[in-house]
Amino acid sequence: MKKVRLTREGYEKLKKELEDLKRKFMYEISERIKEARELGDLSENSEYEAAKNEQGRVGSRIMEIEQILSNAEIIEDSEENDEITLGKWVVIRNLDTGEEHKFRIVTPQEADFFAQKLSSDSPLGKSLLGRKVGDVVKVKAPSGVQRYQVIAVMNK
């Protein structure tokens, strides 16, 4: 498998998720399966089926995270400059509406809209990589072409 690029923060977040899932997998789900078995006939036992399904889902996620972490390449904060690269915080202004947005450019595995983390593989993320303060980018959106100007680029 090829290397998976992650920021240090993204790597640590996945490690924590893995630890939490293993704990859940080892104790909570196993206990629920045990309790459901004690209820008797497994063929009509919805609690048993639900616990087994969750066990499968959690087990799959554990394997997925282990695969990502074993192939991870950590992206360290790059030097202070105004070029947009992975891990940088960016402030852009929509030139049509005047709205400003701040987010961090991250790998697809770390993208999280609610935490202001934009995937480098998204149309906007792709158009911003390598750009500098003052540059204008055009992004095709469902509502039409949007124009954004880079206002600031920061490491933190």
Curated annotation (Swiss-Prot):
Pfam family, one: GreA_GreB
HAMAP family listed in its UniProt record: GreA_GreB
Name of the protein: Transcription elongation factor GreA
This protein's record includes keyword Transcription regulation: yes
Organism, as annotated: Thermotoga sp. (strain RQ2)
MF term (GO), any: DNA binding
Swiss-Prot/TrEMBL keywords: Coiled coil, DNA-binding, Transcription, Transcription regulation
Record-level GO BP terms: DNA-templated transcription elongation; regulation of DNA-templated transcription elongation
